[in-house]
Amino acid sequence: MLRNSKYTAEELWQKDHDHVIHPFTDFAQWDEKGSEIMAEAEGIHVYDTHGNKFIDGIGGLWCVNIGYGREEMAQAIADQVRAIPYYSPFNHLSTPPAGILGAMIAERTPGDLDHMFFGTGGSMANDTAIRFVHFYWNQKGKPNKKKVISRIDAYHGMTYLAAALTGIEFDKIGFDQADELVEYVACPYPYRRPEGMTIEEFGDWLIEDLEKKIETVGAENIGAFIAEPIMGAGGVIVPPEGYHKRTLEVCKANDILYISDEVVTGFGRLGHYFASEAVFGIVPDIITSAKGISSGYQPLSATIISQEMYDVMSIPQADGALFTTGFTYSGHPVCCAAGIKNIEIIDDEDICGHVRKVGPYFEEKLGELNDLPLVGEVRGKCFMMCVENVANKETKELLPPEVNVGGRIADHAQKNGLIVRPLGHLNIMSPPLTMTTEQIDEFVGILKGAIEATQDDLVREGVWNG
């Protein structure tokens, strides 16, 4: 019997299998495999219902920044439940945690991004950002500026509009899209840039591609450009030097708002509360944030806008209509209380400083995997990393999708106590930000062994010659 559960591991598996629809389910394997259920966690480790212990190399899902088992978080959440667990955020009503958290975040955002709308997840944050963009341009008397430019292989969520912003075609199979609102430009993917092109030339080509798209669609029809500072689910794509500054300049020149999707990069993953200015040197018009904002202890997100946007959006409408964007759980007091305590922990323990100090060591140790024949590139920054696996290091040719190389590596790693995320030919890592150098050594040792075991399997099966 599991601790704090009246059900056995087998009973929990069956209930989950029979009744829960999970995100990103492979129904070809679902009936047989079901879910592996994680029941407990502490620090950087999670434990399944059978008591097996794993290093959580994906931080829940890019989000458990402060690590698991924080008693002070549990206490803050419990205290808020006792005080007032919920009240309506509509019609000029609020609770104390929303304003406190808003002020704390405003102290840490770049520029004058001081106003924020709270939600419950990154998809909602990005959906809300587009609603704000449309409302803003309507208020400015430019109602045609509705289009949004996104990028191929970008990931911005899975609500109806956020799914359209997402540029990963595989994620859209079988679903209808709101694609008429979205235009896509090239992915800033240096490893797979056109053959014969230098990084500098590639950077120029990307900017030309954006400028051509704006010219084709018409700046008068484009409301915003949205970009992750480092692309997450698209493969941890770090753009060429100066890319974000140059895209922002193009947007400003064409009267287009700039949305920085910091759902993954925010709250310390790259060593700063927000990466837009501190890492990439830009101050966008909108920042969207979730995941690390509460370290996953409660569902929370924020759509953060500039003073100029707020000034325009807060002008009373001539017909007396209300600003009607809102959700039942916007500014939820328990979620906001978790966000407050999360920031206090990050500050008290200087977790951002820890990431700036230890993150380069994680990069260095993972970089040693480049010597393995199967590894084409190790990339990323600090605690946001990826290994791209290839059939041929020189040509960068991929193994056939049915080989499932990323999944094989992840399976070998998990058997030895490490969870990494497989995405086709990639393995993605986003561990809790509290990971130490000793834990990094263990992490990379297991991952190296998993890649080597996969290499041996592929050679033995005759699907790869090494």
Regions found by a protein language model. Name each.
Residues 1-466:
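Conserved N-terminal phosphate-binding loop of PLP-dependent enzymes in the Aspartate aminotransferase
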